[in-house]
């Protein structure tokens, strides 16, 4: 068995563990900063709950174990979207289908603005990772629909970056209509969020686990 550290930050350590039976990723909150342990455990619980709800879905990690401190999930081979732009139009078609499946299951990801959370697999298909901020809803409340809408807008922003000519008229209208929550986020929450992630945690804007090593 071999272990590779993918990320170390005040919220814990993320490792890639390779065994004779395959590989898995574990997020270990036991190494979190003493003042942030509660937050690290809460985020780990969110990820575990979301992955449990998505059991059996293709294109997302499979939850292997969670003991309240360490989350283990299957490893999905692939490259972040910003490293390996998709070669075919089918990628964003696949991405939209995957996102709809998440939402039908009652899971909103809430962190899809980061290209590092979108993978391009070896088959040029879409996969989504990092469900720490995900939320679940048994009923499609207005809040859930708003979060799902923002997930969709983030996907379409990436499509606009890499395949702008493939956007439909309806998708362009979605891009032109941010929710009030998005406008409030940009005005009030985004500046302190960027300070925490870039200054306190030292994450580059597009950082994925490999770039966040301490």
Tell where the protein language model's regions lie, with residue ranges:
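Catalytic-loop of the protein kinase fold
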Residues: 104-121
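A short acidic, helix-capping loop that chelates divalent metal ions and anchors anionic groups
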Residues: 33-37, 82, 137-139
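C-lobe/activation-segment region of protein kinase-like
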Residues: 122-214
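ATP-binding glycine-rich loop module of kinase domains
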Residues: 2-52
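Conserved structural core of kinase catalytic domains
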Residues: 30, 40-45, 49-98
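Conserved hydrophobic "DFG−1" position in protein kinase catalytic cores
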Residues: 16-19, 65, 74-75, 119-120
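Hydrophobic core positions within the conserved protein kinase catalytic domain
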Residues: 51, 99-103, 116
């Amino acid at each position: 068995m071999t272990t590779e550290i993918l990320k170390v930050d005040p919220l814990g350590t993320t490792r890639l563990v390779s065994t004779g039976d395959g590989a898995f990723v574990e997020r270990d909150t036991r190494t979190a900063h003493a003042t942030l342990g509660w937050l690290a455990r809460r985020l780990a619980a969110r990820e575990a709950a979301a992955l449990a709800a998505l059991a059996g879905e293709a294109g997302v990690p499979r939850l292997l174990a969670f003991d309240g401190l360490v989350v283990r999930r299957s490893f999905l081979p692939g490259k972040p979207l910003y490293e390996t732009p998709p070669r075919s139009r089918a990628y964003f078609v696949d991405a939209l289908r995957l996102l709809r499946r998440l939402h039908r299951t009652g899971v909103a990801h809430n962190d899809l603005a980061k290209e590092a959370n979108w993978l391009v697999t070896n088959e040029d298909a879409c996969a989504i990772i990092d469900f720490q901020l995900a939320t679940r809803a048994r009923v499609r409340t207005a809040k859930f629909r708003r979060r799902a809408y923002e997930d969709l807008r983030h996907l379409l922003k990436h499509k606009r970056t890499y395949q702008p000519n493939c956007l439909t008229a309806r998708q362009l209208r979605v891009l032109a209509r941010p929710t009030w929550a998005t406008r409030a986020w940009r005005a009030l929450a985004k500046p302190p969020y960027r300070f925490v992630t870039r200054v306190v945690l030292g994450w580059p804007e597009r950082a994925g686990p490999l770039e966040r090593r301490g």
